[in-house]
């Protein structure tokens, strides 16, 4: 079961996940790809990760740009699942 991250861990996320922004109980990151096909391929890989974890992102896609927000709605903030999914997404890049 997921658990909310303690304040001490939330404060160090900028060091452990340097490409992600921490805002209002969410992790946020934006990507820009060569074209729509590359953006969609990335989203497909993320979807497979998220489905395997049963933890799904809030995201949007406009042509070659993808924005992802991670939060654990059931807990009302950032959890260890959000950090794990962010790390897995980073490993795809």
Swiss-Prot record:
It is an enzyme of class 4 (lyase). This is Putative pterin-4-alpha-carbinolamine dehydratase. It catalyses: (4aS,6R)-4a-hydroxy-L-erythro-5,6,7,8-tetrahydrobiopterin = (6R)-L-erythro-6,7-dihydrobiopterin + H2O. GO terms for molecular function: 4-alpha-hydroxytetrahydrobiopterin dehydratase activity. GO terms for biological process: tetrahydrobiopterin biosynthetic process. Its EC number is 4.2.1.96. HAMAP family: Pterin_4_alpha. InterPro entries: PCD_sf, Pterin_deHydtase. Pfam families: Pterin_4a (PF01329). PANTHER family: PTERIN-4-ALPHA-CARBINOLAMINE DEHYDRATASE. The keyword Lyase applies. Belongs to the pterin-4-alpha-carbinolamine dehydratase family. Keywords: Lyase.
């Amino acid at each position: 079961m997921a658990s909310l991250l303690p304040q001490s861990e939330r404060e160090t996320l900028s060091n452990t996940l340097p490409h992600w922004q921490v805002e209002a109980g969410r992790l946020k990151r934006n990507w820009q790809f060569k074209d729509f096909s590359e953006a969609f391929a990335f989203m497909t890989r993320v979807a497979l990760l998220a489905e395997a974890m049963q933890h799904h992102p809030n995201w949007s896609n406009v042509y070659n740009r993808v924005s992802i927000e991670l939060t654990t709605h059931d807990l009302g903030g950032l959890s260890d699942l959000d950090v794990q999914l962010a790390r897995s997404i980073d490993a795809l890049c």
